[in-house]
Protein backbone atom coordinates (compact mmCIF):
# COMPACT_ATOMS: atom_id res chain seq x y z
CA UNK A 1 0.00 0.00 0.00
CA UNK A 2 2.89 2.33 0.63
CA UNK A 3 3.49 2.44 -3.12
CA UNK A 4 0.27 4.46 -3.45
CA UNK A 5 0.91 6.90 -0.61
CA UNK A 6 3.40 9.77 -0.92
CA UNK A 7 4.82 9.14 2.57
CA UNK A 8 5.14 5.34 2.35
CA UNK A 9 3.89 2.52 4.58
CA UNK A 10 4.49 4.19 7.93
CA UNK A 11 1.89 6.87 7.30
CA UNK A 12 -0.96 4.43 6.73
CA UNK A 13 -0.02 1.64 9.13
CA UNK A 14 -2.14 2.84 12.07
CA UNK A 15 -5.15 3.22 9.78
CA UNK A 16 -4.71 -0.31 8.47
CA UNK A 17 -4.53 -1.60 12.03
CA UNK A 18 -7.81 0.10 12.98
CA UNK A 19 -9.45 -1.34 9.86
CA UNK A 20 -8.68 -4.84 11.18
CA UNK A 21 -10.01 -4.24 14.73
CA UNK A 22 -13.61 -5.48 15.18
CA UNK A 23 -14.07 -3.13 18.17
CA UNK A 24 -13.05 -0.10 16.09
CA UNK A 25 -15.30 -0.73 13.09
CA UNK A 26 -18.69 -2.38 12.89
CA UNK A 27 -17.52 -4.12 9.73
CA UNK A 28 -13.73 -4.66 9.70
CA UNK A 29 -12.27 -3.93 6.29
CA UNK A 30 -8.99 -5.85 6.68
CA UNK A 31 -8.53 -9.52 7.52
CA UNK A 32 -5.68 -9.12 10.00
CA UNK A 33 -3.13 -11.68 11.15
CA UNK A 34 -1.15 -11.25 14.36
CA UNK A 35 -1.33 -8.84 17.29
CA UNK A 36 -3.74 -5.99 16.53
CA UNK A 37 -4.11 -4.83 20.14
CA UNK A 38 -7.19 -5.16 22.35
CA UNK A 39 -10.22 -3.09 23.45
CA UNK A 40 -8.40 -2.36 26.73
CA UNK A 41 -6.00 -0.01 24.93
CA UNK A 42 -3.23 -2.59 24.64
CA UNK A 43 -1.20 -1.34 21.69
CA UNK A 44 -0.93 -3.31 18.45
CA UNK A 45 2.37 -4.72 17.30
CA UNK A 46 4.71 -2.32 15.55
CA UNK A 47 5.05 -2.45 11.78
CA UNK A 48 7.97 -4.77 11.21
CA UNK A 49 10.52 -5.00 8.47
CA UNK A 50 12.54 -7.95 9.78
CA UNK A 51 15.96 -9.19 8.68
CA UNK A 52 18.50 -8.72 5.95
CA UNK A 53 18.58 -11.20 3.09
CA UNK A 54 21.57 -13.17 4.41
CA UNK A 55 19.71 -14.38 7.53
CA UNK A 56 19.47 -18.18 7.56
CA UNK A 57 15.97 -19.53 8.19
CA UNK A 58 15.86 -23.08 9.54
CA UNK A 59 13.67 -25.70 7.87
CA UNK A 60 12.87 -29.31 8.87
CA UNK A 61 15.51 -32.08 8.55
CA UNK A 62 18.37 -29.63 9.05
CA UNK A 63 17.83 -27.66 5.85
CA UNK A 64 18.51 -23.89 5.91
CA UNK A 65 17.74 -21.15 3.38
CA UNK A 66 18.72 -17.50 3.38
CA UNK A 67 15.53 -15.48 3.69
CA UNK A 68 16.43 -13.42 0.62
CA UNK A 69 16.53 -16.61 -1.48
CA UNK A 70 13.03 -17.87 -0.71
CA UNK A 71 11.70 -15.94 -3.71
CA UNK A 72 14.80 -14.89 -5.69
CA UNK A 73 12.87 -12.60 -8.05
CA UNK A 74 10.90 -10.83 -5.30
CA UNK A 75 10.49 -7.12 -6.02
CA UNK A 76 10.96 -4.46 -3.33
CA UNK A 77 7.80 -3.70 -1.35
CA UNK A 78 6.06 -6.86 -2.56
CA UNK A 79 4.06 -9.70 -1.02
CA UNK A 80 4.92 -13.16 -2.30
CA UNK A 81 2.85 -16.27 -1.66
CA UNK A 82 4.89 -19.26 -0.50
CA UNK A 83 4.01 -22.65 0.90
CA UNK A 84 6.80 -24.12 2.97
CA UNK A 85 7.57 -25.39 6.43
CA UNK A 86 9.96 -23.57 8.74
CA UNK A 87 10.95 -24.25 12.34
CA UNK A 88 9.30 -22.28 15.14
CA UNK A 89 10.77 -21.25 18.49
CA UNK A 90 10.48 -24.80 19.81
CA UNK A 91 12.14 -26.38 16.77
CA UNK A 92 8.82 -27.75 15.46
CA UNK A 93 7.80 -27.43 11.77
CA UNK A 94 5.13 -24.81 11.01
CA UNK A 95 3.73 -23.36 7.79
CA UNK A 96 4.92 -20.05 6.32
CA UNK A 97 2.55 -18.70 3.65
CA UNK A 98 3.93 -15.26 2.77
CA UNK A 99 7.33 -13.72 2.11
CA UNK A 100 7.47 -9.94 2.40
CA UNK A 101 10.18 -7.96 0.63
CA UNK A 102 9.95 -4.76 2.64
CA UNK A 103 12.30 -2.60 0.60
CA UNK A 104 15.44 -0.94 1.94
CA UNK A 105 15.69 0.32 5.52
CA UNK A 106 18.30 1.24 8.11
CA UNK A 107 19.53 -1.92 9.83
CA UNK A 108 21.37 -2.86 13.02
CA UNK A 109 23.48 -5.90 13.92
CA UNK A 110 22.92 -7.62 17.27
CA UNK A 111 26.08 -9.49 18.28
CA UNK A 112 26.43 -11.78 21.28
CA UNK A 113 29.50 -12.35 23.42
CA UNK A 114 30.01 -15.71 21.66
CA UNK A 115 29.97 -14.09 18.21
CA UNK A 116 26.45 -14.97 17.01
CA UNK A 117 24.93 -12.22 14.88
CA UNK A 118 21.67 -11.21 13.24
CA UNK A 119 20.95 -8.01 11.33
CA UNK A 120 17.52 -6.39 11.09
CA UNK A 121 15.61 -3.15 11.38
CA UNK A 122 15.19 -1.28 14.65
CA UNK A 123 11.55 -2.38 15.00
CA UNK A 124 12.20 -6.09 14.46
CA UNK A 125 11.43 -8.20 17.58
CA UNK A 126 13.76 -10.87 18.96
CA UNK A 127 12.92 -13.23 21.81
CA UNK A 128 14.84 -12.27 24.97
CA UNK A 129 15.14 -13.42 28.57
CA UNK A 130 14.03 -10.49 30.73
CA UNK A 131 13.90 -9.99 34.50
CA UNK A 132 10.28 -9.02 35.22
CA UNK A 133 9.95 -8.23 38.91
CA UNK A 134 12.56 -10.83 39.76
CA UNK A 135 11.04 -13.52 37.51
CA UNK A 136 13.11 -14.61 34.46
CA UNK A 137 10.62 -14.31 31.60
CA UNK A 138 10.75 -14.85 27.83
CA UNK A 139 9.60 -11.63 26.15
CA UNK A 140 9.84 -9.99 22.74
CA UNK A 141 12.07 -6.93 22.50
CA UNK A 142 12.58 -4.71 19.48
CA UNK A 143 16.17 -4.40 18.31
CA UNK A 144 16.04 -0.70 19.22
CA UNK A 145 15.27 -1.75 22.83
CA UNK A 146 18.08 -4.30 23.13
CA UNK A 147 21.18 -3.16 24.99
CA UNK A 148 24.59 -4.71 25.77
CA UNK A 149 24.35 -7.23 28.65
CA UNK A 150 20.76 -8.12 27.73
CA UNK A 151 20.15 -11.80 27.01
CA UNK A 152 18.77 -12.97 23.66
CA UNK A 153 17.43 -16.46 23.03
CA UNK A 154 19.19 -18.83 20.62
CA UNK A 155 17.34 -21.96 19.50
CA UNK A 156 19.59 -25.02 19.70
CA UNK A 157 17.34 -28.05 19.33
CA UNK A 158 19.18 -30.49 17.02
CA UNK A 159 17.32 -32.15 14.14
CA UNK A 160 15.35 -35.17 15.33
CA UNK A 161 15.66 -36.68 11.84
CA UNK A 162 18.66 -36.03 9.61
CA UNK A 163 16.65 -36.38 6.41
CA UNK A 164 17.43 -38.40 3.28
CA UNK A 165 21.03 -38.00 2.10
CA UNK A 166 21.98 -38.76 -1.50
CA UNK A 167 25.38 -40.50 -1.69
CA UNK A 168 26.56 -38.01 -4.33
CA UNK A 169 25.76 -35.05 -2.04
CA UNK A 170 27.53 -36.77 0.86
CA UNK A 171 30.68 -37.32 -1.21
CA UNK A 172 30.62 -33.71 -2.42
CA UNK A 173 30.25 -32.48 1.17
CA UNK A 174 33.23 -34.60 2.19
CA UNK A 175 35.33 -33.18 -0.65
CA UNK A 176 34.24 -29.62 0.10
CA UNK A 177 35.24 -29.89 3.76
CA UNK A 178 38.57 -31.50 2.86
CA UNK A 179 39.53 -28.98 0.18
CA UNK A 180 38.44 -25.95 2.23
CA UNK A 181 40.54 -27.03 5.20
CA UNK A 182 43.66 -28.59 3.65
CA UNK A 183 43.38 -28.24 -0.10
CA UNK A 184 43.68 -25.62 -2.82
CA UNK A 185 42.05 -25.04 -6.20
CA UNK A 186 43.74 -22.52 -8.48
CA UNK A 187 42.68 -21.68 -12.03
CA UNK A 188 44.88 -24.43 -13.47
CA UNK A 189 45.69 -26.89 -10.69
CA UNK A 190 44.34 -28.39 -7.46
CA UNK A 191 45.68 -30.43 -4.58
CA UNK A 192 45.05 -31.85 -1.12
CA UNK A 193 47.29 -33.34 1.57
CA UNK A 194 46.90 -34.96 4.97
CA UNK A 195 48.87 -37.19 7.35
CA UNK A 196 45.99 -39.53 8.17
CA UNK A 197 46.26 -42.33 5.61
CA UNK A 198 42.70 -43.64 6.07
CA UNK A 199 41.17 -40.17 5.88
CA UNK A 200 43.30 -39.37 2.82
CA UNK A 201 42.13 -42.56 1.10
CA UNK A 202 38.52 -41.63 1.85
CA UNK A 203 38.99 -38.20 0.22
CA UNK A 204 40.65 -39.70 -2.86
CA UNK A 205 37.84 -42.24 -3.18
CA UNK A 206 35.25 -39.47 -2.97
CA UNK A 207 37.12 -37.48 -5.61
CA UNK A 208 37.14 -40.43 -8.00
CA UNK A 209 33.43 -41.07 -7.43
CA UNK A 210 32.21 -37.47 -7.75
CA UNK A 211 34.72 -35.69 -10.00
CA UNK A 212 36.83 -38.30 -11.77
CA UNK A 213 39.59 -37.60 -14.25
CA UNK A 214 43.33 -38.03 -14.02
CA UNK A 215 44.96 -37.37 -10.67
CA UNK A 216 48.21 -38.35 -8.93
CA UNK A 217 48.90 -39.46 -5.37
CA UNK A 218 52.22 -39.56 -3.55
CA UNK A 219 53.68 -39.75 -0.03
CA UNK A 220 56.75 -38.18 1.56
CA UNK A 221 58.35 -37.88 4.98
CA UNK A 222 58.19 -34.38 6.47
CA UNK A 223 60.34 -32.69 9.14
CA UNK A 224 58.12 -33.81 12.01
CA UNK A 225 58.70 -37.43 11.06
CA UNK A 226 55.13 -37.99 9.87
CA UNK A 227 54.21 -39.24 6.42
CA UNK A 228 52.35 -36.66 4.33
CA UNK A 229 49.99 -38.06 1.68
CA UNK A 230 49.33 -35.78 -1.29
CA UNK A 231 46.72 -35.61 -4.03
CA UNK A 232 47.78 -33.66 -7.14
CA UNK A 233 45.32 -32.66 -9.88
CA UNK A 234 47.04 -31.02 -12.85
CA UNK A 235 43.98 -30.78 -15.10
CA UNK A 236 40.93 -29.38 -13.31
CA UNK A 237 38.49 -29.47 -16.23
CA UNK A 238 36.30 -32.11 -14.53
CA UNK A 239 36.57 -30.38 -11.15
CA UNK A 240 35.33 -27.07 -12.60
CA UNK A 241 32.22 -28.83 -13.90
CA UNK A 242 31.35 -30.11 -10.40
CA UNK A 243 29.98 -27.95 -7.58
CA UNK A 244 33.50 -27.82 -6.17
CA UNK A 245 34.32 -25.57 -9.11
CA UNK A 246 33.23 -22.61 -6.98
CA UNK A 247 36.55 -22.98 -5.13
CA UNK A 248 38.58 -22.19 -8.26
CA UNK A 249 40.82 -19.19 -7.65
CA UNK A 250 39.25 -18.50 -4.25
CA UNK A 251 41.54 -16.81 -1.74
CA UNK A 252 41.73 -18.32 1.78
CA UNK A 253 40.15 -15.16 3.23
CA UNK A 254 37.16 -15.49 0.86
CA UNK A 255 36.10 -19.04 1.71
CA UNK A 256 32.55 -19.69 2.87
CA UNK A 257 29.86 -22.37 2.98
CA UNK A 258 28.03 -22.42 -0.39
CA UNK A 259 24.25 -22.16 -0.58
CA UNK A 260 23.84 -25.72 -1.90
CA UNK A 261 25.28 -27.06 1.34
CA UNK A 262 23.00 -24.88 3.49
CA UNK A 263 20.06 -26.31 1.53
CA UNK A 264 21.23 -29.88 2.26
CA UNK A 265 19.87 -32.07 5.09
CA UNK A 266 21.68 -32.46 8.40
CA UNK A 267 23.28 -35.76 7.35
CA UNK A 268 25.17 -34.01 4.53
CA UNK A 269 26.18 -31.06 6.72
CA UNK A 270 27.52 -33.45 9.33
CA UNK A 271 29.87 -35.09 6.80
CA UNK A 272 31.09 -31.64 5.72
CA UNK A 273 31.87 -30.63 9.31
CA UNK A 274 33.63 -33.91 10.01
CA UNK A 275 35.91 -33.44 6.99
CA UNK A 276 36.47 -29.77 7.78
CA UNK A 277 37.49 -30.37 11.40
CA UNK A 278 39.61 -33.41 10.53
CA UNK A 279 41.62 -31.22 8.18
CA UNK A 280 41.76 -27.84 9.91
CA UNK A 281 40.51 -28.53 13.42
CA UNK A 282 42.20 -29.72 16.59
CA UNK A 283 41.43 -31.03 20.06
CA UNK A 284 43.61 -30.98 23.15
CA UNK A 285 43.46 -31.55 26.89
CA UNK A 286 44.17 -28.47 29.01
CA UNK A 287 45.19 -28.13 32.67
CA UNK A 288 42.55 -28.38 35.41
CA UNK A 289 40.56 -31.03 33.53
CA UNK A 290 39.61 -28.70 30.70
CA UNK A 291 39.32 -29.46 26.99
CA UNK A 292 39.58 -27.38 23.82
CA UNK A 293 38.23 -28.09 20.34
CA UNK A 294 38.98 -25.43 17.74
CA UNK A 295 38.88 -24.62 14.05
CA UNK A 296 41.01 -21.84 12.55
CA UNK A 297 40.60 -20.05 9.23
CA UNK A 298 41.66 -16.85 7.49
CA UNK A 299 38.07 -16.27 6.40
CA UNK A 300 35.73 -14.42 8.73
CA UNK A 301 32.69 -15.60 6.77
CA UNK A 302 33.76 -19.24 6.97
CA UNK A 303 34.14 -18.92 10.75
CA UNK A 304 30.65 -17.39 10.96
CA UNK A 305 29.26 -20.23 8.82
CA UNK A 306 30.95 -22.97 10.84
CA UNK A 307 29.69 -21.50 14.12
CA UNK A 308 26.18 -21.25 12.70
CA UNK A 309 26.20 -24.80 11.33
CA UNK A 310 27.36 -26.19 14.68
CA UNK A 311 24.50 -24.30 16.35
CA UNK A 312 22.09 -26.18 14.07
CA UNK A 313 23.37 -29.36 15.76
CA UNK A 314 22.81 -27.78 19.20
CA UNK A 315 26.51 -27.09 19.84
CA UNK A 316 27.44 -23.73 21.38
CA UNK A 317 30.80 -22.28 20.36
CA UNK A 318 32.71 -19.04 20.75
CA UNK A 319 34.10 -17.15 17.76
CA UNK A 320 36.86 -14.57 17.90
CA UNK A 321 39.75 -13.17 15.90
CA UNK A 322 43.23 -14.25 17.01
CA UNK A 323 46.10 -11.77 17.25
CA UNK A 324 47.77 -13.37 14.20
CA UNK A 325 44.72 -12.56 12.07
CA UNK A 326 43.06 -15.96 12.05
CA UNK A 327 39.42 -16.43 12.98
CA UNK A 328 38.79 -19.20 15.51
CA UNK A 329 35.70 -21.21 16.39
CA UNK A 330 36.21 -22.61 19.88
CA UNK A 331 34.69 -25.14 22.29
CA UNK A 332 36.16 -24.99 25.78
CA UNK A 333 33.84 -26.87 28.13
CA UNK A 334 33.17 -30.55 28.68
CA UNK A 335 29.42 -30.50 28.01
CA UNK A 336 29.70 -28.92 24.56
CA UNK A 337 32.72 -31.09 23.71
CA UNK A 338 30.64 -34.19 24.44
CA UNK A 339 27.87 -32.90 22.19
CA UNK A 340 30.41 -32.25 19.44
CA UNK A 341 31.82 -35.77 19.80
CA UNK A 342 28.41 -37.45 19.56
CA UNK A 343 26.53 -35.20 17.13
CA UNK A 344 29.33 -34.25 14.70
CA UNK A 345 32.85 -35.39 15.56
CA UNK A 346 36.04 -35.50 13.52
CA UNK A 347 36.22 -37.46 10.27
CA UNK A 348 39.37 -39.46 11.01
CA UNK A 349 42.00 -40.23 13.64
CA UNK A 350 41.29 -37.03 15.61
CA UNK A 351 37.95 -38.50 16.70
CA UNK A 352 39.76 -41.28 18.53
CA UNK A 353 41.96 -38.70 20.26
CA UNK A 354 38.89 -36.70 21.31
CA UNK A 355 37.22 -39.82 22.69
CA UNK A 356 40.29 -40.65 24.77
CA UNK A 357 40.50 -37.11 26.18
CA UNK A 358 36.83 -37.15 27.19
CA UNK A 359 37.21 -40.61 28.69
CA UNK A 360 40.12 -39.50 30.86
CA UNK A 361 38.25 -36.52 32.33
CA UNK A 362 36.15 -36.73 35.52
CA UNK A 363 32.37 -36.69 35.13
CA UNK A 364 31.00 -33.30 34.17
CA UNK A 365 29.67 -31.51 37.25
CA UNK A 366 27.69 -28.99 35.22
CA UNK A 367 29.85 -25.98 36.04
CA UNK A 368 30.08 -24.06 32.78
CA UNK A 369 28.77 -20.82 31.30
CA UNK A 370 25.61 -22.44 29.93
CA UNK A 371 23.04 -21.22 32.42
CA UNK A 372 19.75 -19.36 32.85
CA UNK A 373 20.53 -15.82 34.08
CA UNK A 374 18.56 -14.89 37.18
CA UNK A 375 17.07 -18.35 37.70
CA UNK A 376 19.05 -19.27 40.83
CA UNK A 377 18.08 -16.03 42.59
CA UNK A 378 14.42 -16.51 41.61
CA UNK A 379 14.30 -20.12 42.85
CA UNK A 380 15.98 -19.35 46.18
CA UNK A 381 13.65 -16.42 46.87
CA UNK A 382 10.32 -17.94 45.83
CA UNK A 383 10.80 -21.71 46.28
CA UNK A 384 8.40 -21.89 49.25
CA UNK A 385 10.43 -24.74 50.71
CA UNK A 386 11.45 -25.74 54.22
CA UNK A 387 14.64 -24.25 55.61
CA UNK A 388 16.58 -27.47 54.98
CA UNK A 389 15.62 -27.38 51.29
CA UNK A 390 16.40 -23.67 51.08
CA UNK A 391 19.81 -24.38 52.56
CA UNK A 392 20.42 -27.04 49.89
CA UNK A 393 19.35 -24.65 47.11
CA UNK A 394 21.67 -21.94 48.47
CA UNK A 395 24.64 -24.31 48.48
CA UNK A 396 24.19 -25.70 44.95
CA UNK A 397 24.23 -24.21 41.47
CA UNK A 398 20.64 -24.49 40.30
CA UNK A 399 20.84 -22.33 37.20
CA UNK A 400 23.21 -24.50 35.08
CA UNK A 401 21.68 -26.32 32.11
CA UNK A 402 24.02 -29.30 32.43
CA UNK A 403 23.13 -29.73 36.11
CA UNK A 404 19.44 -29.79 35.19
CA UNK A 405 20.19 -32.43 32.55
CA UNK A 406 21.90 -34.69 35.07
CA UNK A 407 20.11 -33.80 38.35
CA UNK A 408 16.87 -32.09 37.38
CA UNK A 409 14.62 -34.33 39.48
CA UNK A 410 16.81 -33.83 42.53
CA UNK A 411 16.65 -30.03 42.18
CA UNK A 412 12.86 -30.13 41.77
CA UNK A 413 12.53 -32.21 44.94
CA UNK A 414 13.81 -29.22 46.93
CA UNK A 415 11.33 -26.73 45.36
CA UNK A 416 7.86 -26.66 46.91
CA UNK A 417 6.08 -23.96 44.92
CA UNK A 418 4.47 -25.49 41.77
CA UNK A 419 4.70 -22.25 39.77
CA UNK A 420 8.42 -21.96 40.47
CA UNK A 421 8.87 -25.59 39.47
CA UNK A 422 7.02 -24.99 36.20
CA UNK A 423 9.02 -21.86 35.33
CA UNK A 424 12.34 -23.53 36.13
CA UNK A 425 11.48 -26.65 34.13
CA UNK A 426 10.44 -24.64 31.09
CA UNK A 427 13.59 -22.50 31.05
CA UNK A 428 16.03 -25.38 31.58
CA UNK A 429 14.75 -28.00 29.13
CA UNK A 430 17.70 -27.32 26.81
CA UNK A 431 15.84 -25.82 23.84
CA UNK A 432 17.40 -22.40 24.31
CA UNK A 433 20.78 -20.85 24.94
CA UNK A 434 20.62 -17.49 26.70
CA UNK A 435 23.36 -15.43 25.07
CA UNK A 436 24.60 -12.15 26.49
CA UNK A 437 24.49 -9.26 24.01
CA UNK A 438 27.90 -7.73 23.37
CA UNK A 439 26.88 -4.92 21.01
CA UNK A 440 24.15 -3.45 18.81
CA UNK A 441 25.69 -1.51 15.92
CA UNK A 442 24.49 0.22 12.77
CA UNK A 443 24.74 -1.92 9.63
CA UNK A 444 23.66 0.58 6.99
CA UNK A 445 20.64 0.68 4.69
CA UNK A 446 19.88 -2.77 3.28
CA UNK A 447 16.98 -4.71 1.72
CA UNK A 448 14.99 -6.50 4.43
CA UNK A 449 12.55 -9.41 4.39
CA UNK A 450 10.04 -11.17 6.61
CA UNK A 451 7.86 -14.27 6.65
CA UNK A 452 4.28 -14.74 7.78
CA UNK A 453 4.02 -17.84 9.94
CA UNK A 454 0.64 -19.45 10.51
CA UNK A 455 0.86 -20.12 14.27
CA UNK A 456 -0.27 -18.42 17.46
CA UNK A 457 3.34 -17.49 18.32
CA UNK A 458 4.22 -16.19 14.82
CA UNK A 459 7.87 -17.10 15.32
CA UNK A 460 10.63 -18.47 13.11
CA UNK A 461 14.42 -18.78 13.37
CA UNK A 462 16.98 -16.43 11.81
CA UNK A 463 20.65 -17.32 12.37
CA UNK A 464 19.45 -19.22 15.43
CA UNK A 465 17.77 -16.14 16.95
CA UNK A 466 14.01 -16.42 17.54
CA UNK A 467 12.32 -13.79 15.36
CA UNK A 468 8.71 -12.61 15.37
CA UNK A 469 7.06 -12.51 11.96
CA UNK A 470 5.49 -9.49 10.30
CA UNK A 471 1.85 -8.66 11.05
CA UNK A 472 1.71 -6.08 8.27
CA UNK A 473 4.24 -4.85 5.79
Swiss-Prot record:
GO terms for molecular function: ATP binding; DNA binding; DNA negative supercoiling activity; endonuclease activity. Its EC number is 5.6.2.2. It catalyses: ATP-dependent breakage, passage and rejoining of double-stranded DNA. GO terms for biological process: DNA topological change; intein-mediated protein splicing; intron homing. The keyword Disulfide bond does not apply. InterPro entries: Hint_dom_C, Hint_dom_N, Hint_dom_sf, Homing_endonucl, INTEIN, Intein_C, Intein_endonuc_central, Intein_N. Keywords: ATP-binding, Autocatalytic cleavage, Cytoplasm, DNA-binding, Endonuclease, Hydrolase, Intron homing, Isomerase, Nuclease, Nucleotide-binding, Protein splicing, Topoisomerase. This protein undergoes a protein self splicing that involves a post-translational excision of the intervening region (intein) followed by peptide ligation. It comes from the Bacteria. GO terms for cellular component: cytoplasm; DNA topoisomerase type II (double strand cut, ATP-hydrolyzing) complex. It is found in: Cytoplasm. It is an enzyme of class 5 (isomerase). Residues 1-473 form the Topo IIA-type catalytic domain. The active site is at residue 49. PROSITE patterns: INTEIN_C_TER, INTEIN_ENDONUCLEASE, INTEIN_N_TER, TOPO_IIA. Belongs to the type II topoisomerase GyrA/ParC subunit family. A type II topoisomerase that negatively supercoils closed circular double-stranded (ds) DNA in an ATP-dependent manner to modulate DNA topology and maintain chromosomes in an underwound state. Negative supercoiling favors strand separation, and DNA replication, transcription, recombination and repair, all of which involve strand separation. Also able to catalyze the interconversion of other topological isomers of dsDNA rings, including catenanes and knotted rings. Type II topoisomerases break and join 2 DNA strands simultaneously in an ATP-dependent manner. Heterotetramer, composed of two GyrA and two GyrB chains. In the heterotetramer, GyrA contains the active site tyrosine that forms a transient covalent intermediate with DNA, while GyrB binds cofactors and catalyzes ATP hydrolysis. PANTHER family: DNA GYRASE SUBUNIT A, CHLOROPLASTIC_MITOCHONDRIAL (PTHR43493:SF5), DNA GYRASE/TOPOISOMERASE SUBUNIT A (PTHR43493). Few gyrases are as efficient as E.coli at forming negative supercoils. Not all organisms have 2 type II topoisomerases; in organisms with a single type II topoisomerase this enzyme also has to decatenate newly replicated chromosomes. This is DNA gyrase subunit A. It comes from Mycobacterium malmoense.
Amino acid sequence: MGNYHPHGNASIYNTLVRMAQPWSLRYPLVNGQGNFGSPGNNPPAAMRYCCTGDALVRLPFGHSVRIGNFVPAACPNSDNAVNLKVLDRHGDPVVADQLFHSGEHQTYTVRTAEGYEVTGTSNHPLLCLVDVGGVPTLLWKLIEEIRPDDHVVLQRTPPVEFGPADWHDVMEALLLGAFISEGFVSEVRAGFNNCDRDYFAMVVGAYDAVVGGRRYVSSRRIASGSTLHELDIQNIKELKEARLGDLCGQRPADKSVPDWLWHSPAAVKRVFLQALFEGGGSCSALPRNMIQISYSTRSRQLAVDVQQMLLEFGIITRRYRHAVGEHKVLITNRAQAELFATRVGFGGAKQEKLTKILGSMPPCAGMDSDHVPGLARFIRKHCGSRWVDKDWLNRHNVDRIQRWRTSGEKILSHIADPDVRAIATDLTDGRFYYAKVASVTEAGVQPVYSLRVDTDEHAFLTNGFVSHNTEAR
